[in-house]
A protein has these predicted regions:
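Bacterial Sec-dependent N-terminal signal peptides
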Residues: 1-25
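Protease-domain processing segments flanking chymotrypsin-fold serine proteases, especially trypsin-like
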Residues: 20-96, 143-151, 156-238
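Short, surface-exposed beta-strand/strand-loop-strand elements in extracellular ectodomains
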Residues: 116-131
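Serine endopeptidase catalytic core focused on the charge-relay Asp
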Residues: 153-361
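Extended extracellular/luminal ectodomain segments enriched in beta-structured repeat modules
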Residues: 102-109
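Glycine-centered tight beta-turn/hairpin loop motif at sheet-sheet or coil-to-beta transitions
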Residues: 105, 130, 227-229
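Exposed beta-strand and adjacent loop surfaces of beta-rich binding modules
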Residues: 107, 120-122, 261, 328
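Solvent-exposed serine/threonine-rich low-complexity stretches and specific carbohydrate-binding patches
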Residues: 132-143
Length: 361
């Protein structure tokens, strides 16, 4: 019996340098306490017409060849010169902080069109109660493209905290071009129209017994934040050299905007079979390079900006080109923005034409 594993980013067929690796530590404000200013300047994002987005989503959600939208992108120009508060910490050290609020948001994430830090500098981003902290982001996150996308943080306000030590080689370049207001939650609310807990009944949490035989392949699959406000699915794939080059396979219809600011979140799995429980959010890689794509067969091959570290415990999935139709198929994916799922098709695949390309269905 021949099985074929399908990483279900081809939703038309099945429903649907370094990167953003954090380098630990804690915000220096935790240690400084009362010695720094308690009042952090706040930028409040403007309101937008949610009813227009809801109407668009009602139509778009019926489409199987576009990413699933979860947020609204505020286009901004926020940097360390025109916003926030600088404080002199003495001995040549400086601290910059800024609070960004988008009223009613379930999550907030950022896109930096300029990100380049000197050695020794640290950037932390956290929500108001510091229940979720991203960082430290450092010069190890610098890329040739000088941009960066961030993962989603829960809540409608976040704080950016940049620490600069003495005698840095150059001034940091930090400029935010997008603040994404999440209005459909990817994290932990089953009451949102889609997202966590809202995939179809044919989808099983990967921790369930049905997923156990596919434990390795499950570790290759990631959910992607595309263009700041949409999501898709894809998988790390192996190559014939087996050298762990971080090639990542996703769908052509996911392409839009620059892949250099895409965020790839691994291990977003429910730790319980039932009911679904939110998974970890901090196994992320920011940025990739597009290597190849084809609209007819709906594929896009990327190379991540860095290989996931060993602590991520990822797997590089195998592939084959025999052309032999499978007798059954398995899909591992993040349907409708949910935690990772596995589903099964026990019927033999048949050949079909899709956008002029030969496919299995």
């Amino acid at each position: 019996m021949k099985n074929t594993l399908l990483f279900s980013f081809f939703v038309a067929l099945f429903s649907y340098s370094q990167a953003q690796i954090s380098y630990g530590g804690e915000p220096i404000s935790n240690k400084l306490g009362a010695s720094i200013n308690k009042e952090i300047p706040t930028l409040i994002m403007p309101s937008f017409d949610q009813t227009v987005l809801d109407a668009e989503d009602a139509v778009n959600d019926l489409q199987k060849n576009i990413p699933w939208r979860f947020g609204f992108n505020h286009m901004v120009n926020i940097n360390t010169q025109n916003s926030g508060l600088w404080e002199d910490l003495g001995k040549g050290r400086k601290l910059w902080r800024l609070r960004i609020e988008s009223n009613g948001a379930t999550t907030i994430n950022l896109t930096f069109n300029k990100y380049y830090l000197p050695a020794g500098a640290k950037l932390f981003i956290y929500n108001d109660d510091k229940s979720e902290v991203l960082g430290a982001l450092t010069d190890q996150n610098n890329k040739a493209t000088m941009d960066l996308g961030t993962t989603l943080l829960s809540g409608d306000a976040i704080i950016l905290e940049y620490f600069e030590p003495k005698n840095v080689a150059f001034e940091a370049q930090l400029n935010i071009s997008k603040v994404t207001h999440g209005y459909r939650k990817l994290l932990n609310s089953p009451n949102i129209e889609k997202g966590f807990g809202n995939s179809g009944s044919c989808n099983n949490n990967v921790i369930c017994p049905e997923g156990l035989p596919w434990g390795n392949q499950i570790r290759s699959v990631a959910v992607i934040v595309v263009n700041g406000n949409e999501n898709c699915t894809g998988a790390l794939i192996n190559n014939t050299c087996e050298d762990e080059t971080p090639y990542f396979l996703t769908a052509d219809h996911c392409l839009g905007g620059s892949v250099s600011t895409w965020v790839f979140r691994f291990n977003w799995d429910s730790p319980d079979c039932s009911p679904s429980v939110n998974g970890p959010y901090n196994f992320t890689i920011s940025g990739a390079t597009q290597l190849a794509n084809n609209g007819g067969s709906d594929f896009a091959l990327l190379e991540l900006s860095s290989a996931p570290p060993s602590s991520y415990n990822v797997y590089y999935a195998g592939w084959g080109n025999t052309g032999t139709a499978p007798t059954n198929s398995i899909a591992i994916h993040h349907p409708s923005g949910d935690v990772k799922k596995i589903s099964f098709d026990y019927d033999p695949a048949s050949t079909a034409s899709w956008n002029g390309a030969d496919t299995w269905r």
